[in-house]
Amino acid sequence: MMTTTVQKNCWRLDQTMLGLEKPGSSDISSSSTDTSAISPISVSSMPLSPDKEKKKISFVRYNPDIPQIVTSFKGYQKLMYQGYRYNIYQIAPERNFKSWRCVCAKKMHDGQWCKCRAETTMDNKNACTKGSHNHPPRHHVAEIEFIKSQLYSAALENPDHDAGDLVNQASMYLSDGVMFDNKESIKKSLVVARNKDGKPKKPRSKRMMKFEVDDDDENEYKMPKLETDISCFLPFINNMVKVEPPFSHTPTIQIPQPIPTPIQHQQQEQSNLLQPATLNGMNNPWMGMEDHLAMIWAANAMLNPGLDVLSTIAALSKHQQHVQGPSPQQAATAPTTASLSSNLSVSSFTPQMPKEASIAIPAPLQVLNLKDLKPLPPLANIQTSPVIQAANLLLPVAALKKDSSTQTTEEIKVSQCLTSGCGCRVIRICCCDEGVCRRTAAC
């Protein structure tokens, strides 16, 4: 009781300060009247606001004789006319013309499709059909789609209205015997349509580079745009890369006729005979070889990847120097092997060479086809080729004398290679008798 009295006195003091109660009015009857005005019963009996009341949504009933345009949940337009449904096919604003195609086009079970068309003006009036349908009209399907289209528009115009109540109100405008197949599915479709309404679509393009930047440095990390087309760089790339034709095209090598020139210019003229297409555009003036030998070697070098290029070039160069004779510089710096006896000269070896060891110089060819060339033997057997054998005959005799002293009689008779560990055969003439070298005393 004491607590209740204190609360009442405090309430009266507040009312007095606010000017709602005159001072001195402290009777119990007045206090009870004031408290009853804010009781829960009086609050619950107050009328609800207009927003909380159920709003009536008006729908238009289906009429098959009037062309009506509907919009599906996906945003596509359809024409409902005389129980048939049409999809938009062509729009021509300059002609005030719209063309519609039947929805049963290319969807018939018997393999045939409806070819009927409908035409309207741009304001969806003055509908007329072109052709005849090969199927009966489906009025109940057209009516359901027509009401669903109105539901879609009403849900977007009234976002606070309950979706279930909208579906129930729309069901009242259906004809007798026509009803929605699944009301819950329609409710979910309305909710999804409301959530997507007003939201921007996600961009299809994805960022190639993902990194976090500050707001101040945002402009510094933007990808630059190409001002010109990339095709302008193609000539520059073509100048850097040289495209060679594959060997499957069987290119031919043109070999011109040799022109008689002085000896001092012969080496330069022969080096110019090498075509750039054969050696990938490289001129080799240090290769003093004849034109047909050079072309044969170059073609075999391309066909045989195991060719020892350096040793073959050295052998061919020595053979060419022997055929042409020493140059003035080589004659001045000739080794002491020139004082050897005439019976050991190079000319003495030439008649005794077998046929397979001699180099047959063919007649000059005009066109050399790469298909006619045979690849050289592998690297392990390259020393037995005629070119290498002829080059071994041109080696200085001093080198032969130094190695021949270490050979046995059996090795000299079978003509084995002077190099230890090599199984190749060397074609030469032995000057020894019964295992005794006749030149040992001369050395």
Curated annotation (Swiss-Prot):
Record note on disruption phenotype: RNAi-mediated knockdown causes multiple defects, including embryonic lethality, slow larval growth, abnormal tail morphology, constipation, abnormal vulva, and abnormal pharynx.
Q: Where is the composition biased (Low complexity)?
A: 25-42
Q: Name one GO molecular function term.
A: zinc ion binding
Task: Write out the entry's keywords from A to Z.
Answer: Developmental protein, DNA-binding, Metal-binding, Nucleus, Transcription, Transcription regulation, Zinc, Zinc-finger
User: Impact of altering residue 114 to A?
Assistant: Abolishes DNA binding. Becomes localized to both cytoplasm and nucleus
Any idea which residues the entry calls the DNA-binding region?
46-203
- Species lineage, top-down? Eukaryota, Metazoa, Ecdysozoa, Nematoda, Chromadorea
Name the predominant localization: nucleus
- Which N-terminal stretch is annotated as signal sequence? none
A single GO BP term for this record reads:
positive regulation of transcription by RNA polymerase II
* Protein name (database record): FLYWCH-type zinc finger-containing protein peb-1
Instruction: Kindly indicate whether the keyword DNA-binding belongs to this entry.
Output: yes
